[in-house]
From Swiss-Prot:
Catalyses which reaction(s): L-aspartate + H(+) = beta-alanine + CO2
Organism classification: Bacteria, Pseudomonadati, Pseudomonadota, Gammaproteobacteria, Enterobacterales
Protein name: Aspartate 1-decarboxylase
Modified residues annotated as Pyruvic acid (Ser) in this record: 25
InterPro entries associated with the record: Asp_de-COase-like_dom_sf, Asp_decarbox
Role summary: Catalyzes the pyruvoyl-dependent decarboxylation of aspartate to produce beta-alanine.
GN (gene name): panD
Length: 126
């Protein structure tokens, strides 16, 4: 059996740019890519917390330390500057590998300040 698992996630980053006329993609600060394990040119899903839209594109690197999250091309219709989004990538693996897999998650606040990283998502409690 093959399973699709969360590979990496940027939780609650703020969109800093939205460029309808750029070729496409989502530019992400290289530090953020490193923290989440997301690679340049990797397929990503973006879930807009602000407006509820969900869309797919691919990641490109933005300048390290810039805190840039730039949604580009047609995807710019799905996000505006200031929107809070979650960016995720996924990986496929065997059922056996999935049993011990841990994603790389980076948590953000304010103006894209990385507050912490984790190898698991906390258990939701009542």
């Amino acid at each position: 059996m093959i399973r699709t698992m969360l590979q990496g996630k940027l939780h609650r980053v703020k969109v800093t740019q939205a460029d309808l006329h750029y070729e496409g993609s989502c530019a992400i600060d290289q530090d953020f890519l490193d923290a989440s394990g997301i690679l340049e040119n990797e397929a990503i899903d973006i879930w807009n917390v602000t407006n509820g839209k969900r869309f797919s594109t691919y990641a490109i690197a933005a300048e390290r330390g810039s805190r840039i999250i730039s949604v580009n091309g047609a995807a710019a219709h799905c996000a505006e500057v200031g929107d809070i989004v979650i960016i995720a990538s996924f990986v496929t693996m065997s059922d056996e590998e999935a049993r011990t897999w841990r994603p790389k998650v980076a948590y953000f606040e304010g103006d894209n300040e990385m507050k912490r990283t984790a190898k698991a998502i906390p258990v939701q409690v009542a």
